[in-house]
Amino acid sequence: MADNTQRQRESISLTPMAHGLENMGAEFLESMEEGRLPHSHSSLPEGEGGLNKAERKAFSRWRSLQPTVQARSFCREHRQLFGWICKGLLSTACLGFLMVACLLDLQRALALLIITCVVLVFLAYDLLKRLLGSKLRRCVKFQGHSCLSLWLKRGLALAAGVGLILWLSLDTAQRPEQLVSFAGICVFLVLLFAGSKHHRAVSWRAVSWGLGLQFVLGLFVIRTEPGFIAFQWLGDQIQVFLSYTEAGSSFVFGEALVKDVFAFQVLPIIIFFSCVMSVLYYLGLMQWVILKIAWLMQVTMGTSATETLSVAGNIFVSQTEAPLLIRPYLADMTLSEVHVVMTGGYATIAGSLLGAYISFGIDAASLIAASVMAAPCALALSKLVYPEVEESKFRSENGVKLTYGDAQNLLEAASAGAAISVKVVANIAANLIAFLAVLAFVNAALSWLGDMVDIQGLSFQLICSYVLRPVAFLMGVAWEDCPVVAELLGIKFFLNEFVAYQELSQYKQRRLAGAEEWLGDKKQWISVRAEILTTYALCGFANFSSIGIMLGGLTSLVPQRRSDFSQIVLRALITGAFVSLLNACVAGILYVPRGVEVDCVSLLNQTVSSSSFEVYLCCRQVFQSTSSEFSQVALDNCCRFYNHTVCT
């Protein structure tokens, strides 16, 4: 009896759960749309006669909810129309806001205007592609004889080569140092071809198009005024955007720690940037940009879809995150394609670290340009070093898709991005502690050994300054700056690019502060040209400590290909290092000094409160001048900051 009572209670208690308040609304809505009462398969009666009390109550509730059902049906039928109306109203409001902002202050609204124009261009492109994509492809496709098509391609290649030679001849007439950078490109390419895995299988189309895209991007960014201004503006906006990190880090750590301690000043930027990148990835903006860049490289260079997507993704994400974009296809990729994936990871830096390097004071425009230029160059050099000799399964982009992550909403994406970056920050901090400690130990050991044979000041940096000096010179760096640049290259290759950029920022800060160029026999700073070329040369993960990171990341995704990854990882590392060096050579060919000449007479004839690079250059002219061009006031100003025999 007790058991029967218990079963009866259980059955009674389950009834409200099945037909309780949670499901009552949905049940009523479904029944009303079907034109029947809840819990009944019969149609609604004409009147309420003949209904019991429960049925009359349900019928009255049905009648009270009938307008809601009609409204719901109307909205469902005209959902597309309502969407268009909402989008139209929102677009009108945004356009009106933009017009008012531009009329009030165009300079202040410039960023919003540029963002709006970029969005409109992308929307117009998508609309044009959807409406006229197939027709445009048929129009631009060459319909002539295959022999004529071949001769047309050869003619265009010959014209491009002759044009490049003529341009170099005219452009380098005033700046012969640019020819050194061109010679560096030739030497590096010859060395890479000599170490190629399959010399006869090299796809010269991929190599030439990759280097051509790299050169065109560099030409636009470095030499043209619109490109230079655009990338400078973009770099300034990123710096302003990253400055908001201080609000969060100051609240957590305090203003004193954020201003004075490196870890609390730089590393929180990585967390903030990673959070933003995760949000952009959730919204699909990152995938859209990656697909467009990959499409451009694939149609010009003839590479496969998977390897091109990975290299394009490396512009924004790190060497371990980019393979996740093509994770389902890694098991079936050829060795040449895997080599491209590795080379792309070594040749670029992560977007989160880009923010950290900018916070050091490294030129933001050069960092952004180096990351973009490295993508086609990595594809080109990888196909030169490890050409394709197998049949790829991914020649077409059909069937290759990018995922949108696991986040269910915007807040989850932001939180996940911040949480993932904690591991990155901890890894960077640990590596800095370890590498700087190892560097100090190595320098102490080398100094101890050097003292035994009367070699004073022997260190790792000194050895690198001699061994890698020819490499720095082939980049186009002036000979007097080559020892410092060679030191930084050695730190980057054998230790870590983070440490190298930190050292470069100290050289730049001393130059901007107006420090003397030489302190004894040690150079205090390097020229602006050397700084720019070094920024390009250091932009990449190609160092020996990254071998374990790359192998660990890829092996965790495809464990059965561990032997394949181990076979080509060192070759990919060397190729990635050469990508950064070729980037620096291209920058060396294209770089021209910018800025207005300083009027030293007017600058020094007034009271100068602090030294700067301009003050140093003007004071050097004062100390070397034998004419009466500079007054005694100018000499006094210079003698307050610098010791010279003239001042005694």
Curated annotation (Swiss-Prot):
It is found in: Cell membrane; Apical cell membrane. Residues 105-109, 168-178, 223-261, 319-337, 387-423, 480-534, 593-648 are extracellular. Glycans are attached at residues 605, 643. GO terms for biological process: azole transmembrane transport; cytidine transport; nucleoside import across plasma membrane; nucleoside transmembrane transport; pyrimidine nucleobase transport; pyrimidine-containing compound transmembrane transport; uridine transmembrane transport. The chain crosses the membrane at residues 81-104, 110-128, 148-167, 179-195, 202-222, 262-283, 295-318, 338-360, 367-386, 424-446, 458-479, 535-558, 570-592. InterPro entries: C_nuclsd_transpt, C_nuclsd_transpt_met_bac, CNT_C_dom, CNT_N_dom, Gate_dom. This is Sodium/nucleoside cotransporter 1.
